[in-house]
Amino acid sequence: MIRVGVLGAKGRVGTTIVAEVEQNPNLELSAALDHGDDLQELVDAKTDVVVDFTQPDSVMSNVEFCIRNGIHAVIGTTGWTEERYETVRSLLQDSPKVGVLVAPNFAISAVLTMKFAEIAAPFFESAEVIEFHHPNKLDAPSGTAVHTAEGIARARREAGLEEQPDATAQSLDGARGSDVQGVPVHAVRMTGMVAHEEVIFGTRGQSLTIRQDSYDRESFVPGVVIGVEKIADNPGLTIGLEKFLGLD
């Protein structure tokens, strides 16, 4: 039985995760904490793994607390940068048995979309990413879209492809999206949407569209459970769920 603490327990995703932990026979809810609650409750409750769906401005202090107290962490909170990853790696040097998983998306369909995009990238001259989310999302573009674009860019470099063709000389600010290592990324914020992504590839006489849709926050649950069940066997920092799904 894995004792699980949920941070952001009253949030949209957090409430879904709490409900899953409470009904999953292999998991036990040790603590359900939200803004203002004392993290020491995690230690007092002998928590094995923390699931964090909080806010970008609080996630780093949460992760540091977990690492210093020997608690594994499964992180779905967004707003990660390379500097933040380096901070976590540094903290983990003093706690080599602790595992931290940071995943830009826990929906297995989204993880597969990123993998499929990486496979397709070397075969097309052009690639662009469009992500769609609800209007309450704080960051743009999403971590999933950035991660997708980075994978495409890496695959293009390894294949020796040239820069994408684009003769645009004049444009309104933002019309061509954000440039992520040479891959344009566009963000849509729209009422009624949850989390969706399209990756569009094009080359001579043909195009390929890969699309993923999360219609409900239940879509994140299977991936989170996999992370919780496997994190103890994967010490150190893991970025993305791919390794835990055998896709790396």
Curated annotation (Swiss-Prot):
A GO cellular-component term linked to this record: cytosol
Organism superkingdom: Bacteria
Localisation per UniProt entry: Cytoplasm
Top EC class, one word: oxidoreductase
Signal peptide span: none
EC number from the UniProt entry: 1.17.1.8
Reactions listed under catalytic activity: (S)-2,3,4,5-tetrahydrodipicolinate + NAD(+) + H2O = (2S,4S)-4-hydroxy-2,3,4,5-tetrahydrodipicolinate + NADH + H(+); (S)-2,3,4,5-tetrahydrodipicolinate + NADP(+) + H2O = (2S,4S)-4-hydroxy-2,3,4,5-tetrahydrodipicolinate + NADPH + H(+)
InterPro entries: DapB_C (IPR022663), DapB_N (IPR000846), DapB_N_CS (IPR022664), DHDPR_bac (IPR023940), NAD(P)-bd_dom_sf (IPR036291)
Pathway: Amino-acid biosynthesis; L-lysine biosynthesis via DAP pathway; (S)-tetrahydrodipicolinate from L-aspartate: step 4/4
Similarity section: Belongs to the DapB family.
Function (record text): Catalyzes the conversion of 4-hydroxy-tetrahydrodipicolinate (HTPA) to tetrahydrodipicolinate.
Name used for this protein in its record: 4-hydroxy-tetrahydrodipicolinate reductase
Species name: Corynebacterium urealyticum (strain ATCC 43042 / DSM 7109)
Lineage: Bacteria, Bacillati, Actinomycetota, Actinomycetes, Mycobacteriales
